[in-house]
Each structure stands twice: as structure tokens, then as C-alpha cells.
């Protein structure tokens, strides 16, 4: 299986790695930079922890970098 391991960076998974994943979560700078993203290969879908979103799939290049609209942008000026 070929999985993305970074932005526009696909790599062939090692033997046994037949699941691609994209994991996103907020850290202390989420409001400035957006969610953190980790991508890669695994033998099974990683365990979901509180506050972490994980998407798993098992076909080539099925885990592209998430398209985000920055919710951290604040409107300028007064309404």
C-alpha cells in the first residue's frame, strides 16, 4: 500500500503496513496554526484518544493531507 507520510509525500509502506492513517488534533497553538496532522502507515488503525480524530483506509494514496478552512481566522473590524 502507498500512503502519504506528509504533505504530498507518498511512500510505499513496509511489509505488514497495510493501513494508511491521518491523525489530527489540537495543541496549545491550535488557534494560531490549526490542527496538528500526523500521517503514515500502520498494521492496524491507531487507537482513538479523546480529542484526536483518526481516519484509516487501505487503498493507495487514500490519506491525503486534510483540506482545512482555518477556523482560527478572526473577522477584522467591528460588525
Swiss-Prot record:
UniProt subcellular location: Secreted
A molecular function (GO) term: ion channel regulator activity
GO cellular component, one term: extracellular region
One Pfam family linked to the record: Toxin_cobra-type
Tissue specificity as recorded in UniProt: Expressed by the venom gland.
Keywords, alphabetical: Acetylcholine receptor inhibiting toxin, Disulfide bond, Ion channel impairing toxin, Neurotoxin, Postsynaptic neurotoxin, Secreted, Toxin
Disulfide bond annotation, renumbered to this chain: 3-20, 13-41, 26-30, 45-56, 57-62
Recorded coiled-coil stretches: none
Domain of life from the UniProt record: Eukaryota
Gene3D superfamilies, A to Z: CD59 (2.10.60.10)
InterPro entries xref list: Snake_3FTx, Snake_toxin-like_sf, Snake_toxin_con_site, Toxin_cobra-type
Note: Exists in two forms which are separated by reverse-phase high-performance liquid chromatography, but which have the same sequence and molecular weight. The existence of cis and trans isomers may explain the two different elution peaks.
Family: Belongs to the three-finger toxin family. Long-chain subfamily. Type II alpha-neurotoxin sub-subfamily.
Cited function: Binds with high affinity to muscular (alpha-1/CHRNA1) and neuronal (alpha-7/CHRNA7) nicotinic acetylcholine receptor (nAChR) and inhibits acetylcholine from binding to the receptor, thereby impairing neuromuscular and neuronal transmission. Produces paralysis, clear dyspnea and lethality on mice.
Designated name of the protein: Alpha-elapitoxin-Aa2e
